[in-house]
Amino acid sequence: MREGGVMKKRLLALIVAFAVLTAGCLGSESKEVTLIVFHAGSLSVPFQEVEKEFSEYAERNLGIKVSFQDEASGSVMAVRKVTDLGRKADVIGVADYTLIPQLLIPNYTDFYVLFATNEIVIAFTDKSRYVEEMKSNPDKWYEILAREDVRFGFSDPNQDPCGYRSLMVIKLADLYYGKEIFKELIEENTNIYSNGTQIYAPKEITVNPGKIVIRPKETDLLGLVESGSIDYIFIYKSVAKQHNLSYITLPSEINLGDFSKEKFYGQISITLGSTGKTIKAKPIVYGVTVLKDAPNREVAIEFLRYLLSENGKRIFEKNHQDFLEPPIAFGNVPEELKPLVSIEK
């Protein structure tokens, strides 16, 4: 009997030890979260800094270890990963907020927040052809780009807002300067065309490779201009500054960075072959949302709360990107975010 009692005690001790060990494993597992973030390439630098700070904040204040699985792409592609490919994500951050109501609402999300701005510039290095002339006579930018020995680039308008915004900038230049700049730079070197103030970007774009280079997202062009493979790129001002590129600013009437010029910008629109959607030119505003079926929705909303706070603003402004004050939200805004935003109907 004594031996049987000892065996029972040992068995009970093993069961208790296993239960404690299992509970400990489950407990630590439940506190580790990976947020999946699909975002615009131009958000890469500030998002990485926000994510690093948020991870430290979450572990210290929420008791959660948060890691991030980031995928940078053109914003159109970021959205299509969800709508066309059925990919799961927690957070979507885009360089053109209108992609969210146009393509994600109501099936994939029910709210979005406008939070940051930007403008289009023309960036280059000391290796670029006619660089001194570009610096001293920036108003001649379209003449310099048109020269036979100059190559320039922009991102794919079917995948990336920076691409279709670059085309909008060039078409707006027609109106501002009273010259056929779009025809000379774009129509004579690609199958992209315009009819009046309407631009059409075919699903499959072809280019004269000796003149124009197109890449999926604007950050894919950085290495090409830095190496001297191409001379000039249309890119966001924040990205040019983050990567220490030289650049010229464009008139506010065409750079898509001035809210007071919204009516002038709105004369131009583009139809994308990739989505069939028509997008009207407007000031550049970034948008962010958490998807309805986000694998870690509660933590994703906490991340947005951190992003939209003074912490996110500080990081974005450090990285040369202006923050909306306050951010503007639409739709069924989560309660946690309401104190940080202005809610519009």
Swiss-Prot record:
It is found in: Cell membrane. It comes from the Archaea. Molybdate binds at residues 41-42, 75, 160-162, 218, 236. Its main location: membrane. It is a peripheral membrane protein. Tungstate binds at residues 41-42, 75, 160-162, 218, 236. GO terms for biological process: molybdate ion transport. Keywords: Cell membrane, Membrane, Metal-binding, Molybdenum, Signal, Transport, Tungsten. GO terms for cellular component: plasma membrane. NCBIfam families: PRK04168.1, tungstate_WtpA. Monomer. The complex is composed of two ATP-binding proteins (WtpC), two transmembrane proteins (WtpB) and a solute-binding protein (WtpA). PANTHER family: MOLYBDATE-BINDING PERIPLASMIC PROTEIN, MOLYBDATE_TUNGSTATE-BINDING PROTEIN WTPA. Belongs to the bacterial solute-binding protein 1 family. WtpA subfamily. Part of the ABC transporter complex WtpABC involved in molybdate/tungstate import. Binds tungstate and molybdate, with a preference for tungstate. This is Molybdate/tungstate-binding protein WtpA. The gene is wtpA.
